């Protein structure tokens, strides 16, 4: 059986190339890109990356635009919280 990676995980495919710090950055991106996310439409963990910035739920079939490597970008979270806060100010 082939030897498995212990520390490097998904970036073991790069071997010793590109340097350790760059491989750590890439590992963070690739782990988030391949993980499953929570679907806000059906309530299940079924959202996976289809292409760059396109995320689709395998359970309900909904497709959502998001970030390249994560489903929600930092700026999108900021905008969503600002809109929520402004709505609450208007209502009450």
UniProtKB/Swiss-Prot annotation:
Coiled coil: none annotated. It comes from the Eukaryota. It holds the Pfam family Ribosomal_L37ae. The keyword Zinc applies. GO terms for molecular function: structural constituent of ribosome; zinc ion binding. Keywords: Metal-binding, Ribonucleoprotein, Ribosomal protein, Zinc, Zinc-finger. Gene3D superfamilies: 2.20.25.30. GO terms for cellular component: cytosol; cytosolic large ribosomal subunit. SUPFAM superfamilies: Zn-binding ribosomal proteins. A zinc finger (C4-type) spans 39-60. GO terms for biological process: translation. The keyword Metal-binding applies. PANTHER family: 60S RIBOSOMAL PROTEIN L37A, LARGE RIBOSOMAL SUBUNIT PROTEIN EL43. Belongs to the eukaryotic ribosomal protein eL43 family. This is Large ribosomal subunit protein eL43y. It comes from Arabidopsis thaliana (Mouse-ear cress). The gene is RPL37AC.
